[in-house]
Every structure is written in structure tokens, then in C-alpha cells.
């Protein structure tokens, strides 16, 4: 099978990482890159020994698919142009600035039967991949995503920059529509919200309490899932998953299970166990790009679809709307 011809649009910090990873994927031929900053594109092209294209149209004329790592404001125009030219897309999160734009990309992708994968990278975190043998059905979720201040990314609110990772994960876990959103947030050092907290209620009764900050003294990327007979703790920075379960007395134990205690007796006896699922040693960015390539080559549904990106953006925008309403009341 011939190699997939790929291009990268936008070669800032993340686009440079795309370039590096794609060069290391065996069934991909990285045709070249494009950036509105021509000097930057030429510098990156020289660094990796590839070609820099002066215009987006020139690059699109040579490829089967592109990855889009521009700033968020440019996502829609670049993506729409690529889809209209019949190109498959890997587009970084958030998928677009507005729901209307996201819906248009979803429509175009369906109409032209093209693959669109959104770069919600935490779906490919080793901690998440380690849960593949567990049934995830949380009724309460607590997440904290805290980062030290970095001017890169402040073109959007922290809800769209950081919190959207957790929003996407929670939506993938909770198979129920969102019923209500409450939120508060503050712009501390930038012109947009730098710290935010949201409470997301679902129709099935699940509640998610989500906090994100880009002005923290220390870093943290953790999530806790509480469900019937099970508590799951995830550390995305460490790629670690820990599971505390209540099991029947005669249920076989998985490898690496530690008994913590017992409840009841006889046929009613249940055991509290601790498990640390084996994690896969993967580079999350490379892995999600590999799966995008696989989806394009085999014409299969990607793990994170354009519709997934739209849903995450819809909830993120609802959170921002609530924060703005709070401001107006002050």
C-alpha cells in the first residue's frame, strides 16, 4: 500500500511536534508544511529537511490529508478550504471558535465522505488506554487541570485551552445528554478567563465538577471517577490509573490486585481491592496521529470525530456563557 501523502498547516510549537512525529510514522510521506509566517515555515522546513509551501493551495494540491495546528481563529477557514478540496483532516482542539463553524465542518465532512479527527490528545493518554478492560459509568467526576502561566495559548480562554480536554473525556464517559451547566471564572493576567470552575449536570444524574487554571504555582492533571462499586483515579501527567473496586468474594482477581479489606460475611462477603492497570508505553501525540492515518487508509471512523469536537466545544461555550453572565451581574 502506498504511503499517505500528508502536510502540516501551522508550524508553531504544536505544529512542529506534528512535523517531527509524522516523519517517524512509516506509512506516511510528509510532503511539506505551510505557515502564514513564511520565514518560520522555511526555518522549520530546513530543520527537518522538508519542503515549505508558500500558499495553502499549493500544499493542498500535493497531499491526501493535512494536520491543522494553526491558532484557533484560523481553524475554520483552513479546514473548510481543505475539505472543499477533498482532503482528510486532523485538526487540533478546539475544533473551531464557534458551534456554527463546527457544524459546517461536520456537514462538509459528511457530504464529501472525508475523515476528520479532532486532537483531543488525552483520549490517547496511557492512563486512559489502561482502562480498556473496565466499564466506565461514572455518577460523579472531579477533575483538576492546573498549569503554570505561559503566554502561548492565551488567545483563548482557559476553558478552550485546557478545560476542554476534560470536557471531552467526561462526555466520552457519560452516555447521557447535558442537562445543566453552572460556572464561574476570572481573567487574572490575560484578557480572557485564566481560571474557571464548572459544574456539569447530566440527565442521568451524573455530576462533573471541573476546574482549570493556567496561573497555578504547580502543575496538576488529575481526574477522579466515582461509580457504583468502583472509584478510579487518573493522573494524566504520570500516565497512571488506579482502581479501587468492591468485588464479590469469589470473583477472580486480576494480576496485580491488592486486597484492602472485607465487607459482610458468608455469601454476602465482598472484598475491597486495589488495582493498578498496566499502562502502555506510548507517545500520545504520535499514537493519535498514527490512528488518524489508519482511519484514513482504511476508511474507518476515527476515535475522536468532528462531532465529538463539536460537542466538547458546545459544552465549553456554555461554560463561557455562564461565566460571562456572572460578570454582567457584578
Per-region residue spans from a language model:
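Contiguous beta-strand/loop segments that form the cofactor/metal-binding neighborhood of enzyme cores
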Residues: 167-244, 279-299
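Beta-loop-alpha module in the N-terminal Rossmann-like domain of NAD(P)-dependent dehydrogenases
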Residues: 18, 48-106
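A short helix->loop->beta-strand "cap" motif at the edges of active sites that frequently abuts
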Residues: 50, 85-87, 112-115, 206
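Hydrophobic residues in well-ordered beta-strands that form the structural core
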Residues: 54, 91, 116-118, 142, ...
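C-terminal helix-rich "cap/oligomerization" subdomain common to oxidoreductases
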Residues: 65-67, 287-330
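A contiguous active-site-proximal alpha/beta segment in oxidoreductase catalytic domains
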Residues: 96-153
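N-terminal Rossmann-like dinucleotide-binding module
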Residues: 1-48, 170
Amino acid at each position: 500500500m502506498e504511503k499517505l501523502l500528508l502536510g502540516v498547516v501551522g508550524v508553531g510549537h504544536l505544529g512542529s511536534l506534528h512535523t517531527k512525529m509524522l516523519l517517524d510514522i512509516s506509512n506516511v510521506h510528509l510532503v511539506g508544511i505551510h505557515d502564514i509566517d513564511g520565514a518560520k515555515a522555511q526555518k522549520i522546513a530546513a530543520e527537518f529537511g522538508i519542503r515549505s509551501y508558500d500558499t495553502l493551495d499549493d500544499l493542498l494540491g500535493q497531499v491526501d490529508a493535512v494536520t491543522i495546528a494553526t491558532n484557533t481563529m484560523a481553524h475554520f477557514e483552513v479546514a473548510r478550504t481543505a475539505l472543499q478540496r477533498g482532503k482528510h483532516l486532523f485538526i487540533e482542539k478546539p475544533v473551531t471558535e464557534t458551534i456554527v463553524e463546527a457544524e459546517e465542518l461536520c456537514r462538509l465532512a459528511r457530504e464529501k465522505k472525508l475523515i476528520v479527527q479532532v486532537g483531543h490528545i488525552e483520549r490517547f493518554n496511557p492512563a486512559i488506554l489502561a482502562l480498556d478492560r473496565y466499564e466506565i459509568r461514572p455518577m460523579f467526576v472531579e477533575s483538576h487541570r492546573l498549569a503554570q502561566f505561559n503566554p502561548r495559548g492565551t488567545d483563548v480562554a482557559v476553558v478552550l485551552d485546557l478545560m476542554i480536554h476534560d470536557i471531552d473525556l467526561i462526555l466520552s464517559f457519560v452516555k447521557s445528554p447535558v442537562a445543566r451547566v453552572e460556572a464561574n471564572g476570572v481573567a487574572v493576567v490575560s484578557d480572557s478567563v485564566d481560571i474557571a470552575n464548572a459544574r456539569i449536570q447530566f440527565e442521568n444524574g451524573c455530576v462533573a465538577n471541573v476546574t482549570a487554571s493556567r496561573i497555578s504555582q504547580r502543575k496538576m492533571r488529575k481526574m477522579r471517577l466515582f461509580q457504583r462499586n468502583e472509584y478510579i483515579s487518573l493522573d494524566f501527567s504520570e500516565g497512571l490509573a488506579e482502581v479501587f473496586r468492591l468485588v464479590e468474594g469469589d470473583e477472580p482477581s486480576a494480576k496485580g490486585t491488592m486486597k484492602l479489606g472485607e465487607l459482610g460475611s458468608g455469601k454476602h462477603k465482598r472484598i475491597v481491592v486495589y488495582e493498578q492497570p498496566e499502562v502502555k508505553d506510548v507517545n500520545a501525540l504520535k499514537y493519535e496521529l498514527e490512528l488518524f492515518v489508519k482511519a484514513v487508509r482504511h476508511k474507518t471512523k476515527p476515535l475522536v470525530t468532528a462531532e465529538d469536537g463539536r460537542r466538547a466545544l458546545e459544552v465549553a461555550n456554555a461554560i463561557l456563557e455562564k461565566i460571562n453572565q456572572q460578570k454582567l451581574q457584578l
